[in-house]
Amino acid sequence: MLLKTFYTQQWLDDETFKKLLTFSRFLGRDKNGSQFVIDIERARRNKVKLDDILSILSELGIELSETDLREMAKYLPEYDVEFELKDGKLIIKPHVFILDIIKDYKDKGILKYDKQSKVYVTDPYYYYQIKNRLEENGLKIKDLGLDVKELNINFKGELRDYQKEAVDTWLQRGSGVIALPTGAGKTVIGIKIITEVRKSTLIVTFTKDQMLQWRDAILKFTDANRSDIGLYYSEEKNIRPITITTYHTAYRHIDELSGKFELLIIDEAHHLPADRFKEIALKCIASKRLGLSATPVREDGKHEELFKLMGGLIYFKTPQELIQKGYLAPFELIQIRVNLTSKEKLKYATLLSQFRKVAGGKKVSELIQLVKEGNSNAIEAMKIYNEMKKIVNLAENKLKALDDIIQKENGNKILIFTQYVDQAEEIAKKYNAYLITGKTNKNEREKILRIFKTLKSGILVLTTVGDEGLDIPDANVGIIVTGTGSRRQFIQRLGRLLRPSNGKVARLYEIVTRGTAEEYQASKRKDITFGLDIYSSSEEDLV
């Protein structure tokens, strides 16, 4: 865009001439002197500011009218780049040429250029990265003017040596994932980090129960007032210097939450890479990020996305390391193998044959994707597959083996895990055990946990609701009647037993059906290390 034409009769040395060419074009000489025209696009490309143009012209005795100044200010504003948030996206409005600075972001598909609006569009996650890059290159930035509150609270607890190491490692980096076994005090680490950052914090939990546990732990381990903590959930949506929400609520309301926090804490962070939930991290601007998980490695490989969004895996300890130091109870893993009955074997074999025929050699992961696309063959194959799993999980001899284990462990505190509510109810009724499923209301659940905690012996039956998010009292025996095959679930269940107690050795029994995919998965778990190589046998192993 060409604007004001100007003349100068002064002799121009090379340096001055080159400066003029950074924001104007030389049109030639005539009787009035050297003629130039101001070129806005050239000025932008060379990152020349309006003040610089006026200074150079002033040295040559050239004054611009108020009209010219207003027109130039419109196209060459005070800032080189402006940021704004719009519809959950970060808008980058350049007034100078910046592609040379951010080309790598554009090449990777992180930045999109809107030709009509002449702006770059990306996720708010990249705000600080791009802002810092532009400032390092000398550009003047109009930032988002974020409303981040100060947080003046102090830590009242005591950290174990590995917790101190984890906190120090995180503080050196300002972001990252900390992986520690269940029962190792990840929440306390998060609270200590909140008191060190001393800025407004958003905590995202997987369940409502975890949300309440975080609130209670913050009140216990800091001098924070209850008014410092806001729960953002259901009808109660209070934003405070410390705001606690759930994955589902954060996903739905992230545009409201995005720019208000300096620190983002993601609990049970292995859930974050799910297609919907990763939007929480992508749309949140927080410059400091902490992920907490007992099992950060995902079976689908998406943990790499988790590490990218949260700052990489920066600290971890295995259960074995903490057991050696006495922080967790030692444990035994005991696999009990049972046979299918003749009737179950026949039905399983028939279904397996049907599955292989309908699946056409495709892996289960491929079938699941095809189901999402509405493929009828894949839908039929997965129906058969689920029937096969049900035969294995509900095998008659599993309940006989369960009976033997319960008799053997009589007098201990036992947790029984199953995938099926009907099976859980049947087991609880048979052994006069306590029962918690997804159908158990909050008050009843709290009552059961409170009672079970006081018992020296007893049985508590749990469905998958017990895998994460429940503060389950100490027990020393666990029995997996049915599971998903996931190592993550296996580790979560083992973790329920590892809280230390005098002379306690935790035992986790797994009842496995011979001659099925369940047996293959169980054999792979024998070599479990609990470190970063916690990859489960995937769904591919089931057929």
Swiss-Prot record:
Region of interest (N-terminus), residue spans: 1-111
Stretches assigned to the Helicase ATP-binding domain: 167-314
Catalysed reactions, semicolon-separated: Couples ATP hydrolysis with the unwinding of duplex DNA by translocating in the 3'-5' direction; ATP + H2O = ADP + phosphate + H(+)
Motif stretch (RED motif): 298-300
Annotated region described as ThM region, given as residue ranges: 340-394
Pfam families: ERCC3_RAD25_C (PF16203), ResIII (PF04851)
Positions bound to ATP: 180-187
SMART domains to which the protein is assigned, alphabetical: DEXDc, HELICc
Domain Helicase C-terminal: 398-543
Region forming the signal peptide: none
Keyword Isomerase: yes
Gene3D superfamilies xrefs: P-loop containing nucleotide triphosphate hydrolases
CDD domains listed in its UniProt record: DEXHc_RE
Region of interest: Flexible hinge region: 320-328
Membrane-spanning parts: none
Keywords, alphabetical: ATP-binding, Helicase, Hydrolase, Isomerase, Nucleotide-binding
SUPFAM superfamilies: P-loop containing nucleoside triphosphate hydrolases (SSF52540)
Motif DEAH box in this chain: 267-270
Domains as described in the record: The N-terminus (residues 1-111) is essential for DNA destabilization, it contributes strongly to ss- and dsDNA binding, but does not contribute to ATPase activity.
More about this protein: Conventional DNA helicases unwind DNA by binding to a ssDNA overhang of dsDNA and then translocating on this strand with cycles of ATP binding and hydrolysis to 'unzip' the dsDNA. XPB1 is believed to be an unconventional DNA helicase principally because it translocates in a 3'-5' direction along dsDNA instead of ssDNA, thus it is referred to as a DNA translocase.
Biological role stated in the UniProt entry: ATP-dependent 3'-5' DNA helicase. A DNA-dependent ATPase; single-stranded DNA (ssDNA) stimulates the activity more than double-stranded DNA (dsDNA). Binds ssDNA better than dsDNA. Destabilizes dsDNA in a non-ATP-dependent manner; blunt-ended DNA is a better substrate than 3' overhang DNA. Probably destabilizes by binding ssDNA, increasing amounts of ssDNA decrease destabilization while increasing amounts of single-stranded DNA binding protein (SSB) increase destabilization. Bax1 does not stimulate the ATPase.
Similarity annotation: Belongs to the helicase family. RAD25/XPB subfamily.
Protein name per Swiss-Prot or TrEMBL: DNA 3'-5' helicase/translocase StoXPB1
